[in-house]
Amino acid sequence: MQYLLLIYSNEAGMAAAPKEAAVQMSAAYGAYTEAMKKAGVFLAGERLKPTKIATTVRVAGGKTNVIDGPYADTKEQLGGYYLIEVPDMDAAISWAARCPGAGTGTMEVRPIWPMAEYMPAYTA
């Protein structure tokens, strides 16, 4: 089953961290990603650019409203993700707990809901 591991962290805190800490974190993420690839669970993963360059889009009454910045002002921001394929939620949680981001922020584990399961007529 596929799971999305969402990585939340405090952007301001990460930006203020010493350069050496950033280098160490990058190395830790590189090792983590390689471990996922070697285990055959890695499908995709990327870091996201800072929320200050994000755009929020809403459509109401046929009108598109575009707002600079993220949807919500929170202490932790979505900073990256991994898409993995593992047997069950326990395995996904195990991989999330090993992510370097789990030690500095919050990991959210979301099962992927294949469209064929909830809209079979549209995927035939």
Go through each PLM region and give its residues.
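Conserved, structured core segments of small domains
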Residues: M1-A124
